[in-house]
């Protein structure tokens, strides 16, 4: 499908922590990537460490631009993971808790996903969170 590709911005607005992976406060971080057809553009929020003292039911205002540009192909792949930090993902003693992953490929037929995607429930056996993000035309 050949079409004019718009200039887009993917903005991670909020994360509602329904249940973190720990008893009491959690230490939250987010990782993922956006691929417009030219390769994965990774991100981490915060860039290092974690967001401390996050309690169940708390909403985090993230407001981070994950990607900007004109897609190089007819696909815009958005992948966002929520994590509760413990001793690292590969720890045998107390690994980080995966709270859920959002993964979707937007196409011109979906208007590139333009609009607000609010309170998307994501969960694993270790926790649950609600993702809100927006894709905007520049």
Name what the model sees in each region.
Residues 14, 34, 82-84:
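Short beta-strand segments enriched in hydrophobic/aromatic residues
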Residues 3-6, 73, 124:
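Compact integral membrane and secretory-pathway proteins
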Residues 4-7, 52-57, 107-110:
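Short linear motifs at secondary-structure transitions and domain/linker junctions
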Residues 18-29, 47-50, 61-67, 79-138:
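C2 and C2-like phospholipid-binding beta-sandwich domains
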Residues 7-9, 27-29, 75-77:
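Beta-strand-rich binding-surface signature
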Residues 2-23:
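Short amphipathic, basic-aromatic surface patches that mediate peripheral association
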């Amino acid at each position: 499908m050949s079409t004019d590709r718009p200039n887009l911005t993917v903005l991670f607005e909020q994360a509602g922590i329904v249940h973190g992976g720990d008893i009491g406060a959690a230490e939250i971080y987010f990782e993922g990537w956006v691929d417009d057809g030219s390769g994965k553009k990774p991100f981490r929020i915060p860039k290092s460490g974690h967001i401390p003292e996050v309690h169940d039911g708390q909403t985090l205002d993230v407001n981070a631009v994950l990607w900007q540009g004109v897609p190089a192909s007819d696909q815009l792949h958005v992948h966002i993971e929520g994590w509760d930090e413990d001793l690292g993902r590969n720890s045998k003693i107390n690994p980080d808790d995966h709270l859920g992953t959002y993964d979707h490929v937007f196409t011109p037929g979906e208007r590139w996903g333009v609009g607000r995607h609010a309170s998307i429930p994501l969960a694993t056996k270790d926790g649950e969170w609600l993702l809100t993000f927006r894709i905007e035309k520049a």
